[in-house]
Amino acid sequence: MRNIIVEPLNQTPIEDQKVEIVERKGIGHPDSISDGIAESVSRALCNAYLDRFGAIMHHNTDEVQITAGESAPQFGGGEVIKPMEILLTGRGIAEVDGEKIGLDRIAISAAKEYLRENILNLDVETCAVVECKIGHGSGDLRDVFARKGRAPLSNDTSFGVGFAPFSETERIVMEAENLLNSPEFKKKHPAVGEDIKVMGLRENDNITLTVACAMVDRYVSDLEEYLEVKNVVRDEVFKIASKLTDRNLEVFVNTADRCEDDEPSVYITVTGTSAEMGDDGSVGRGNRANGLITPNRPMSMEATSGKNPINHVGKIYNLLSNQMAGDIVESVEGVKQVHIMILSQIGKPIDHPKAATAQVILEDGYTMDEVTGKVSGVMDAWLEDIPSITEMLVKGQLRTF
């Protein structure tokens, strides 16, 4: 019997709160690049372990650090003077039953491939130096297969949190960044780099979006063209946000620009990310497991990306909580808002947490007696099927930042 608790949440629903703040760091933000590399390295190791040994061996690659380089951007195209440095650290199994695997090679290859696929104007070979300092360990397949068929044991006493549904402001912030970094948008507007941050503020029924967007200098010939691209970004963000809300909207882009000065100062880059000059990055310093930073909502400080997907509850429980929450609001009639908290106990099976709690706000006309059993059933089903979280992670089907 699992310890599942369902209780009412005595809190003003998010849409009725007077002030709401939401942030998303886009895929080209240095912190997000760190998250993306960490997760891609973990996924590459998982698949390499499965191919070679038939099982995922222990590893954690969640300690990626980016040290910014130096660049000289200018209209029409500048240059990278000093490449950014990317340090891969953590721990991984490099030898199983006397058979070695190229852990460093796999990690470096995965990191570079991630950069090529996601930072389109970055020359990975000349503008980034990737160094692997992942600690090497050895493993025994007999121990791994002896545990097969049983739930993994929690590696820590930790917790995960999630909530659903997204508010209007949360959806707008997420969709705005997703639009600006979509392949379709990049084809139409190559001057828009990947280092994008969207900050949303809702004051009652007034939503203000502040967008920071690194422009790629080679696609912008002068100040006039830069301002044209800024206007496109503003208009497209306004357009997609308008489809998601009837509230009043205002959109600002690159508010630190100084265009009227004798020597204009604007946000242009050589590569599309501020990591090329002055902006460092670290895993876990940006978006939470659901892709947003939401001070109005419950959040865990745990970094999700790069942690092993087998028994690292700091990763699994945060992702599981969000899956649970989404299923509850979708399938349980009468639930207006739900917060999920799951707590592990070190050394105990991860499918039997110390406590799994759902706090719910109901629609008018519904009672806790009507929803408690259904909510508990959704949570129990997800805990029973917890290996599916691992499977989705290995296949790259779950976003971790």
Swiss-Prot record:
Pfam families per record: AdoMet_Synthase (PF01941)
Lineage, top-rank taxon, reads Archaea
Q: Which GO terms describe its molecular function?
A: ATP binding; magnesium ion binding; methionine adenosyltransferase activity
Matching InterPro entries: AdoMet_synthase_2_family, AdoMet_synthase_3, S-AdoMet_synthetase_arc
Instruction: Give the metabolic or biological pathway.
Output: Amino-acid biosynthesis; S-adenosyl-L-methionine biosynthesis; S-adenosyl-L-methionine from L-methionine: step 1/1
> Which BP terms in the Gene Ontology apply to this protein?
one-carbon metabolic process; S-adenosylmethionine biosynthetic process
Keywords on record: ATP-binding, Magnesium, Nucleotide-binding, One-carbon metabolism, Transferase
**Per its UniProt record, what HAMAP family does this chain match?**
S_AdoMet_synth2
**Which family does the record assign?**
Belongs to the AdoMet synthase 2 family.
What is the designated name of this protein?
S-adenosylmethionine synthase
- Which species expresses this protein natively? Methanothermobacter thermautotrophicus (strain ATCC 29096 / DSM 1053 / JCM 10044 / NBRC 100330 / Delta H) (Methanobacterium thermoautotrophicum)
